[in-house]
Amino acid sequence: MDELASPTHPRMFSLQKIVEISYYNMGRIRLQWSRIWEVIGDHFNKVGCNPNEDVAIFAVDSLRQLSMKFLEKGELANFRFQKDFLRPFEHIMKKNRSPTIRDMVVRCIAQMVNSQAGNIRSGWKNIFSVFHLAASDQDESIVELAFQTTGHISTNVFEKHFPATIDSFQDAVKCLSEFACNASFPDTSMEAIRLIRHCAKYVSDRPQAFKDYTSDDMNVAPEDRVWVRGWFPILFELSCIINRCKLDVRTRGLTVMFEVMKTYGHTFEKHWWQDLFRIVFRIFDNMKLPEQQTEKAEWMTTTCNHALYAISDVFTQYFESLSDVLLDDILAQLYWCVQQDNEQLARSGTNCLENVVILNGEKFTPETWDKTCNCMLDIFKTTIPHALLTWRPAGAEGDPMTPQDISDRQLVCTVGLPVSLVYLLCQIRPYSNITQYHADKITSAHVPSGLNFPEQRLFSALLIKCVVQLELIQTIDNMVFFPATSRKEDVENLAAAQRDALDAADVLVETQDQGMYRYLTSEQLFKLLDCLLESHRFAKAFNANNEQRTTLWKAGFKGKSKPNLLKQETSSLACGLRILFRMYTDDSRQTAWEEVQRRLLNVCSEAVAYFLTLTSESHREAWTNLLLLFLTKVLKISDDRVRISTINNIDRPLIWSVEVERGEVAGEEAQ
């Protein structure tokens, strides 16, 4: 080393002799040669990192020649000397920052791969380690050559010599992952992800190679080796790409990760899925989300949103395998999504819950239904925007009315209404023609910059809760009755009312159960009903509290008009009544008829009493349409049980309100 210390004229005589000694002793038995190389290899480590580039170049070139000669000898099974022999390349690549030397190391390794791939065994680990270090470089030529060689190994060498490379398979995948995470070369990133996807094919086509593989440091059951050595490294590295890269690359990584699951998941064992989803759920980990609000919002709106739908698809595709081991985790993840201050993610959470139920509900066990209904109940309870009724600007005084106060004031003790009233009201859906004239989309609210930051956050969170409430109402309606059925009923009811055609020849509503209604117990339906009515009563309380709505409006909670929850008020009641009426006409639920009738009469009485207190023309108009459809359905009901039990209980206020409405219509026509 002293001879090489001169910065201008280093003497390389001794280094040359060391190279010759290595060359002539290469034929010794492994035990002897390994001891010799232990000393010589350490010397090459130091010389290869010499600040004098000429010395380092000589050392690397000498190493290349020795390595080519050594690799020609091949390597017997269970030996690891190639790994020791090639380690100086790895050390030099890690420690030497000279672009010239690093480029030279990569070229030396590339030459070995191209000429000696068939003889390399344990040396693959060093090769991938060198390329892994090159993958994060900023020098385009280094990255390009390293990636080309890695791609050649992944597509050609693996195809021909897979058993010899299997020990380094996960190193290859890790190396490709590092290329994908180099933000300076986006094209290389995308191609690296494609190659990882290609590696999945080797695992699928050659599972026996993984089962047969053994090593001293491997204490894994043969049936799990294909997971530990094959599938897990691929999926784990894809998850690392998702967590480390910018949007376009991580989106591609996410897509490929779920493509692998969907394509090859049928070969996965149940406990493999548990390991896999521990990785997947890291995408939603609060501790791993970006700290900046803008980046966090982008992450939730794009990556979390994409992952959520993909998880739902995979869960549906492999429901039989996953329902026992992952249902609780998936429901918990959906619940987490609707709790975040991100409207898109909250909507997606409810939509995915709906998809999971509609696509798999026929296969649900009673226990699964209980868990699902409880999840919906939890979401409903935690997303009711109670602060809408209690918020006051700084310095304001006064106690706002609670939902219970409003409900108590409006609930009038009346004689029970005909059960047939339900039929009309339960057919009305928030997106039908009946409510098209409403300009009540609270999600279009504008929060002015004049509010301080905590109030902005509060208003934003309240708006998202309003969105979730509407989405959940729609989810329950779609889940229980199936979307197409409900929409068809709405159209038929409205058409009948508009034609004023009351004879039996009119189009009859189909009553076949296309949704999940027949799979839900009465107790589960009552749970959902309670959620709907709680949501309805809250919306009703808010809509009736003009003072609070005005306060929020002045604070900028909604832009051009007072905020309202008309859609939540009407759609929740319509869905609840739809459920009650269906149960009341279901012969298989006779044991629940008494409870259903009691609930029907209470709900209908409360609804009509509330309608009679309305003063807003648009508000009354919405309910007038509901009553109009109700009357149309009453005259079509032919169920003697319904008529006998309710004919004498028609509420006088209802008749009076209809007469008033008819009088107003007649007066307008006369004018």
What residue ranges belong to the model's regions?
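Surface-exposed polar/charged interaction patches
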Residues: 286, 290, 379-382, 386, ...
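Short coil/turn segments at helix-helix junctions and helix-capping linkers
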Residues: 2-12, 28-31, 43-58, 73-76, ...
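Extended repeat-based solenoid scaffolds, especially LRR ectodomains
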Residues: 1-18, 437-453, 457-461, 465-486, ...
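Aromatic/pi-system hotspot detector in well-structured domains
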Residues: 18, 33, 37, 82, ...
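Short alpha-helical linear motifs
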Residues: 81-85, 128-131, 147-150, 169-172, ...
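HEAT-repeat alpha-solenoid elements in large eukaryotic scaffold proteins
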Residues: 7-25, 39-44, 56-69, 85-88, ...
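Acidic, Ser/Thr- and Gly/Pro-rich intrinsically disordered linkers and low-complexity segments
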Residues: 1-9, 99-100, 209-222, 284-304, ...
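Intrinsic low-complexity, polar/charged intrinsically disordered segments
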Residues: 499-671
